[in-house]
Structure formats: structure tokens, C-alpha cells
Amino acid sequence: MSKRDFYEVLGVGRDASEREVKKAYKRLAMKFHPDRNPGDKEAEASFKEVKEAYEILTDSDKKAAYDQFGHAGVDPNRGGGGHGGADFGDVFGDVFGDIFGGGRRGGGQRQAARGSDLRYNLELSLEEAVKGLSKELRIPTLVACEPCDGSGAKKGSKPTTCGTCHGQGQVQMRQGFFAVQQACPTCHGRGKIIKDPCNKCHGEGRVEKSKTLSVKIPAGVDTGDRIRLSGEGEAGEFGAPPGDLYVQVSVREHAIFQRDGNNLYCEVPISFSKAALGGEIEVPTLDGKVNLKIPTETQTGRMFRMRGKGVKSVRSHAVGDLLCKVVMETPVNLNERQKELLREFEETLTGQSKKHSPKAEGFFDGVKKFFQDLNS
């Protein structure tokens, strides 16, 4: 049986934040957890499905692979690996522990959370995308508090062991015949208490701040490309590792060129006389103007390829081409002398359309035959 889409499993959109994914996971994991549905095989299968979706969509690398390749990109049988099925004990700790501020790993203490990943949408001109550049980005984020060095405790003091749970992060509560472990209500699962909190971060260990980063954009990027800056996301809780920053690239439409992969396309207007007699015209490229030789009797719509005048691939040394489509432009605002010359020219073609305009002659012959067949 084919797997369901992970976003569908959790009931979130593809643009859902990590927080939204986690919220959906908690709700569904609690609903389908085997301890709440003893003997229910369907609930157990749904629980495993929710667990797997959550593990993929909260891991930035696995999520990127899934978004690009679907289930094939995260299939453990395609690379040797995998979690080997859902661990009910771990998930019980993840879900119910997080609700109270802690889990059961690490001897019962809630592990300080890694910083959240950030996304920055960067819009570039075609010239910037093709040639590459360095960009200064101003990112609003959470950074480690400097006065307390991220500990949350005022300088000169430090967190103390919680007296309620004795540093375990959990306490045992009795409900009828059952003893239930839950996060310590005093320290919220950390196992430590900040008695003298830092004045700047108020015991949080992190503060809001905008930071400026210089990001090198490689030549050849295109809309949809993503640049990962490891460790430049939000600071983690109480010294935990920071998240990553993902720069999402989009390229504005250009007035002259259209891009398709590494090739560029443009339309170049030419005069009637230039198309008939041939000659040279100037063609724009991203490196400046170049001359293009137009053969005699060139028809409108003809495509000319200028090799190596396209875009350098961001993933190799290959360079695309510039494809120029010539479009014959009908002259306008003619004076009487110019019109008279065209009439004289037209008269010289009378009776010679097959010689000078073979396509038109063939077209009208076809129209004539069509009506003859229609009336026969």
C-alpha cells in the first residue's frame, strides 16, 4: 500500500512552520497513542504514521529531501538506515513531556531545545543571479544573552538543582491505581531552577536582536534555489546548538530576457529590408552588445543561437546559450514617397509570388483546394 503524503498525515500545509508541525504532531500522537487505544491496531498504525511524518518534517535535511523527491528521498532502504519503527516510549516522553515542558530523556530532564531554523526570502535581478554577488542581510532573530552567556542566571550566579524533583526533571503522580511520571511543575522539566535571573533576558537565556550577515550568492542561482547557512538561525535554549538560516532565492522578471535553465531567450526586431537583404544587427547580452549576422531572405521568427552567451551553471562549469528570435517589424508612419516606393515594389512582384513568396503561394493554393473539395 502506498504511503500517504506526510503533510497530509499531520494535516498541515507545505509551508507550515516547525512550530505548526510540532503542534499538529502532539495532538495526533496523543489521539492515537497505544496507551490510550489498547489493542486498537488501526490506532497503532496511525500512531506510527504520525511519528514518521513528524521525524521527517522536523529534520531540515530529511524535509528538504522529501520536498524534492517525495518518499523515495527518505526511504531508509535506499541508503541503509532508518529508525526501524516507532518507539512508543520515546514518543510518550516527547508528546506528554513537552506539554508540561519536559521529556523523559537524559535521566528524566528535558533537553534544552535546539534553536529554530529561519527562512529569508531574497529577491534578485537576473543580472545578480547570473553573475553572483555578496549580499548584506539583516535578520531579526533570537541570540544568546551576552550578560549571562545564555544561562539565564544573573552574572556571578548559576542555576541550582531543583528541590522538588532533585534534579531529575520529573515527579511521580499517583492517579488511582497508576503512578504517572510527569514534568516537574517547579522547574518545568529542566532539573534546575534560576533563583536569580538575568536582568536582560529575565531568565530566558535569549534575547531578540537583529544581526547582519554577509552572504555570498553563487553565480547561476535561479528561482527556487536555497542556500543554507549552518548555525545562523535562532540561538538554542540555554546553550543548546543554534538553528540554521535558509536563504530562499527568487529572480525578478527581466524586461528583455527570459531564462530557461541555463539558456536565455530574447526577441530582436529587424526591418523588412534587413530581413530581405541581410546584414548585421546589434544584439543585447548580459555582458554588453554583440553583432549578429543576418543572412539574406531571413523569415520572421527564425531563431539564432549564440553559444556561451547564456548562464553559467551553479552546479558545473557548463554555460548555456543565448537564443535570439528575430521578428520582422512592419514599418509605420510612412510618408507618401515611401508608400509609393512600396507600391512600385509590390507591382514588380505581380505574377511572381511563387518565386518570391513560396510559403504564401502554397498557403493560398491550399485554401483554394479546400473550398474546391468542400463544394465538390
Curated annotation (Swiss-Prot):
Gene, per the UniProt record: dnaJ
Cofactor note: Binds 2 Zn(2+) ions per monomer.
Source organism of the structure: Shewanella piezotolerans (strain WP3 / JCM 13877)
Function: Participates actively in the response to hyperosmotic and heat shock by preventing the aggregation of stress-denatured proteins and by disaggregating proteins, also in an autonomous, DnaK-independent fashion. Unfolded proteins bind initially to DnaJ; upon interaction with the DnaJ-bound protein, DnaK hydrolyzes its bound ATP, resulting in the formation of a stable complex. GrpE releases ADP from DnaK; ATP binding to DnaK triggers the release of the substrate protein, thus completing the reaction cycle.
List of residues binding Zn(2+) 2: C162, C165, C184, C187
UniProt domain comment: The J domain is necessary and sufficient to stimulate DnaK ATPase activity. Zinc center 1 plays an important role in the autonomous, DnaK-independent chaperone activity of DnaJ. Zinc center 2 is essential for interaction with DnaK and for DnaJ activity.
Protein name stated in the entry: Chaperone protein DnaJ
Main location class: cytoplasm
A single MF term (Gene Ontology): zinc ion binding
The keyword Hydrolase belongs to this UniProt entry's keyword annotation: no
Cofactor(s) required, per the database record: Zn(2+)
Gene Ontology terms describing biological process: chaperone cofactor-dependent protein refolding; DNA replication; protein refolding; response to heat
